[in-house]
Amino acid sequence: MQMSEPLSQKNALYTAMNRFLGAVNNMDQTVMVPSLLRDVPLDQEKEQQKLTNDPGSYLREAEADMYSYYSQLKSIRNNIEWGVIRSEDQRRKKDTSASEPVRTEEESDMDLEQLLQFHLKGLHGVLSQLTSQANNLTNRYKQEIGISGWGQ
């Protein structure tokens, strides 16, 4: 990164990760009885996503209920905080290294910055969507148990 970039741009990914982690932690603290989320449909969320044409909506439509949504968000939070299992990473590296074409060092260096920018933009977008999901789940839980105006 260049030194002339504003501080907000330098920490954009860090800020997005913190927003997501904060939203999931808030969700985790609010949802005192996660089993109440079982069999609660995502219909309200689906209607909202159809109106906004959200790029991640197809993932949420595949989920059966709010409990699976809750579990998924907590799992993603744990992966961000603690990392993924190393044995899976090593196995994937072995599988992909055999199929990767051989590149020269110059080609690799030129592509690295573009590749990093592509993935950072994607990661930032995904983190924003996940933060929104965690906040929506928290609000929906409050509605379901009748405390929708509390804590706001």
Swiss-Prot record:
Membrane spanning stretches: none
Organism: Danio rerio (Zebrafish)
Swiss-Prot/TrEMBL keywords: Cytoplasm, Cytoskeleton, Microtubule, Nucleus
One example of a Gene Ontology biological process annotation: regulation of lipid biosynthetic process
Function text: Involved in stabilization of microtubules. May play a role in the regulation of lipogenesis.
Any single GO CC term annotated in Swiss-Prot or TrEMBL for this entry: microtubule
Gene3D superfamilies: 6.10.140.1610
PANTHER family reported in the protein's UniProt record: MID1-INTERACTING PROTEIN 1-B-RELATED (PTHR14315:SF19), SPOT14 FAMILY MEMBER (PTHR14315)
Compositionally biased tracts (Basic and acidic residues): 87-105
Lineage: Eukaryota, Metazoa, Chordata, Craniata, Vertebrata
Protein family membership: Belongs to the SPOT14 family.
Span list, region Disordered: 87-109
Localization (cell): Nucleus; Cytoplasm; Cytoplasm, Cytoskeleton
Name of the protein described by the UniProt record: Mid1-interacting protein 1A
Tissue-by-tissue expression: Expressed for a short period in the cells that will produce the enveloping layer (EVL).
InterPro entries per record: Lipogen_MT_Stabilize_sf (IPR053719), Spot_14 (IPR009786)
Main location: nucleus
